[in-house]
Amino acid sequence: MAAGSITSLPALPEDGGGAFPPGHFKDPKRLYCKNGGFFLRIHPDGRVDGVREKSDPHVKLQLQAEERGVVSIKGVCANRYLAMKEDGRLLASKCVTEECFFFERLESNNYNTYRSRKYSSWYVALKRTGQYKLGSKTGPGQKAILFLPMSAKS
């Protein structure tokens, strides 16, 4: 490029596509927990835990933006929403309630955290055993609260 020349960038495609394929952010995800290497799993009976097998159909999750920085997490196969109860338990609800909204934050280590909007100092977390961790036992800096969203396509 010669000094003083102006470069123009190509226009975005009409379909709004760009660096990411269409629907990229709406594709189902698996949430991989740094603590123990588990994927967050939502069962059809309402239980929530972690499993190491990424092929388990109940680890396929749909993260839906509800407002800026706030998501709901739905188990695709279970057709239930992740919820945090007032005692800190994680379970899966048939319908969306205030307990189903989580602040999604990208941390400096490139993992995401999911903090309850209703119980604002509690996080979604998995123990090293794959069991969920009570919200009241969670806090910033714990490995149990760190999740890596991975594609669940295929």
UniProtKB/Swiss-Prot annotation:
So what does this one do? Acts as a ligand for FGFR1, FGFR2, FGFR3 and FGFR4. Also acts as an integrin ligand which is required for FGF2 signaling. Binds to integrin ITGAV:ITGB3. Plays an important role in the regulation of cell survival, cell division, cell differentiation and cell migration. Functions as a potent mitogen in vitro. Can induce angiogenesis. Mediates phosphorylation of ERK1/2 and thereby promotes retinal lens fiber differentiation.
List the lineage, top down.
Eukaryota, Metazoa, Chordata, Craniata, Vertebrata
Description of post-translational modifications: Phosphorylation at Tyr-81 regulates FGF2 unconventional secretion.
* Family recorded in the similarity comment: Belongs to the heparin-binding growth factors family.
Q: Which Pfam families match?
A: FGF
Residues the record lists as binding heparin = N35
Major localisation: secreted
Q: Which organism is it from?
A: Rattus norvegicus (Rat)
Subcellular location, in the record's words? Secreted; Nucleus
Q: What is this protein called?
A: Fibroblast growth factor 2
